[in-house]
């Protein structure tokens, strides 16, 4: 069974975690919520705090070796917190080093900037972080979903059906020879 890590903390955009998690589980994959803290993490939806989700593993209990792919949901607070967590950045970098699929949506690519893995990559994101990605060396496009050698990105919750579909496709393909950290 394929195991997928969904890296998140308090303030993640609820639909950007729930929708991919549900799609992955419907495919028969195990989708673990990985977070810096144990217990529960609280989502953000429609401008307010929303539902809490159980953390399956803490970041210090796992490594990229334990998983087949990584998903990075957005939200404004979630990536802003994760991008300052050294263990989270190492975890993200290791997926790239191992050439495993990585998917990020909305503000999720901010974590990838801090992990220093976007230079030379083609991707999309929420429009407000476009300049940050370009300044970090990425090639940014305003499209619903971009796939760059196992690296899947989307702009916002409206793109989730296409994002989920491409994510599953990349997981089924596995490692990518051209994926680089």
Sequence positions of predicted segments:
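Extended, subdomain-level signal for the structured scaffold at the beginning of enzyme domains
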Residues: 1-98, 102, 111-122, 130-181
């Amino acid at each position: 069974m394929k195991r997928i890590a969904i890296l998140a903390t308090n303030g993640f955009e609820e639909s950007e975690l729930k929708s991919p998690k549900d799609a992955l589980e419907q495919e028969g994959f195990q989708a673990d919520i990985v977070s810096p803290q144990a217990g529960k993490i609280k989502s953000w939806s429609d401008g307010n705090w929303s539902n809490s989700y159980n953390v399956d593993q803490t970041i210090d209990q796992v490594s990229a070796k334990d998983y087949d792919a990584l998903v990075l949901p957005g939200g404004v607070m979630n990536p802003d917190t994760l991008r300052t967590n050294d263990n989270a950045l190492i975890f993200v970098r290791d997926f790239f080093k191992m050439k495993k699929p990585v998917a990020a949506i909305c503000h999720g690519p901010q974590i990838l900037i801090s992990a220093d893995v976007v230079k030379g990559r083609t991707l999309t994101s929420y429009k407000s972080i476009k300049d940050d990605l370009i300044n970090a060396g990425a090639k940014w496009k305003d499209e619903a979903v971009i796939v760059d050698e196992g690296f899947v990105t989307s702009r916002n919750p409206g793109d989730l059906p296409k994002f989920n579909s491409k994510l599953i496709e990349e997981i089924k393909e596995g490692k990518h020879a051209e994926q680089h950290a």
